[in-house]
């Protein structure tokens, strides 16, 4: 039944309001599958997955995840994202008028919560299209920023923008996080929505601790569930997200990182209501629909003419799925979390 419905949706034959209703039903189904309403079963599932994470590589299926998102032509993200190319949740306060403003608010929030100041050495893990790297380079001209991405197209994009803006205080490295070793230490390490692709947090946190100066700090932004932690799998019709957009990924719990403090100590955690991500995702969808005539030729070149329309619908579904997930229960079920750690 779900498989047949998805085929109709991917052909654009189902109205958005029905698609969104179906997504909300799947959100409820996910809560039930993860034993959200049975504390004993949920506790055991959490424990079992925690043990699995400790035996895993730092990250898995990095090639697939890279292909699903980050090696798409930059032009698509130019038409879908905001001015800063921020491919993660923005923040909409009571005065925010549009996505561009919401991006700026969240980027400035990182600077405040991460305690960034001019003159620091900074490492960004998983820099995406450079929204934060470029923001930091502009705001802190005496800082030196090193950023790593698993995507060569992202490196090329960031390097080109930096050249346009006359920024020479940043270095972009294309590297799989499993293999990365910086060879030096930093005052700040930051990561925005990359740790959802990580499996072995303890191993990565141990590495990060060794990459920090004695007074250094780690700032992390992730999306998460309030208390559930589970992997995205690819089997079955209802695991559409894992199959097409999130291979090897997982949904951390807001408390997951509290279990991995052997070499890093948590200073503070902030929860950000999921409705900010809901609004961000809906803005991406609106941009995508508005720019369909520009996006379709990109998809024809990327996916082939026979599959361009299907992939246009898949990206629409992806943005709707994100919006409905994070908007569920008024943003109090799935959300964003920020963390500030100090080196022990």
Regions found by a protein language model. Give the residues of each.
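Substrate-binding/catalytic lobe of Class I Rossmann-like enzymes that use SAM or dcSAM, i.e.
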Residues: 224, 231-336, 342-344
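Conserved SAM-binding motif I beta-strand of class I
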Residues: 144-149
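A short acidic, Gly/Pro-enriched loop at the edge of an enzyme's catalytic core
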Residues: 178-189
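Conserved class I S-adenosyl-L-methionine
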Residues: 118-128
């Amino acid at each position: 039944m779900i498989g047949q419905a998805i085929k109709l949706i991917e052909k654009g034959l189902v109205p958005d309001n029905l698609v969104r209703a179906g997504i909300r039903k799947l959100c409820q189904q996910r809560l039930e599958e993860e034993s959200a309403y049975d504390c004993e079963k949920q506790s055991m599932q959490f424990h079992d997955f925690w043990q699995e994470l400790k035996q895993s590589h730092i990250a898995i299926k990095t090639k697939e995840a890279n292909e699903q998102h980050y090696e798409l032509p930059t032009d698509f993200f130019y038409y879908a994202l905001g001015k800063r190319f921020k491919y993660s949740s923005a923040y909409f306060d009571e005065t925010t008028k549009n996505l561009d403003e919401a991006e700026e608010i969240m980027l400035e929030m990182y600077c405040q919560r991460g305690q960034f100041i001019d003159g620091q050495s900074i490492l960004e893990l998983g820099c995406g299209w450079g929204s934060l790297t470029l923001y930091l380079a502009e705001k802190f001209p005496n800082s030196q920023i090193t950023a790593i991405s698993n995507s060569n197209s992202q490196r090329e994009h960031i390097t080109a923008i930096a050249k346009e803006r006359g920024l020479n205080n940043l270095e972009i490295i294309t590297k799989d996080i499993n293999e990365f070793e910086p060879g030096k230490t930093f005052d700040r390490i930051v990561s925005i929505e990359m740790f959802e692709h990580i499996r072995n947090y303890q191993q990565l946190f141990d590495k990060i601790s060794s990459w920090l100066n004695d007074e250094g700090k780690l700032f992390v932004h992730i999306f998460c569930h309030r208390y559930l932690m589970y992997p995205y799998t690819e089997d079955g019709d209802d695991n559409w997200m894992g199959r097409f957009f999130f291979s090897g990924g997982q949904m951390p719990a807001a408390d997951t990182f509290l279990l991995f403090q052997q070499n890093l100590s948590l200073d503070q955690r902030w929860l950000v209501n999921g409705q900010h991500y809901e609004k961000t995702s809906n803005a991406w969808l609106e941009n995508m629909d508005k720019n369909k005539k520009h996006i379709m030729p990109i998809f024809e070149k990327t996916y082939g003419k026979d599959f361009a329309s299907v992939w246009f619908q898949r990206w629409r579904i992806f943005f709707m799925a994100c919006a409905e997930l994070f908007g569920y229960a008024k943003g109090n079920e799935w959300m964003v979390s920020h963390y500030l750690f100090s080196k022990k």
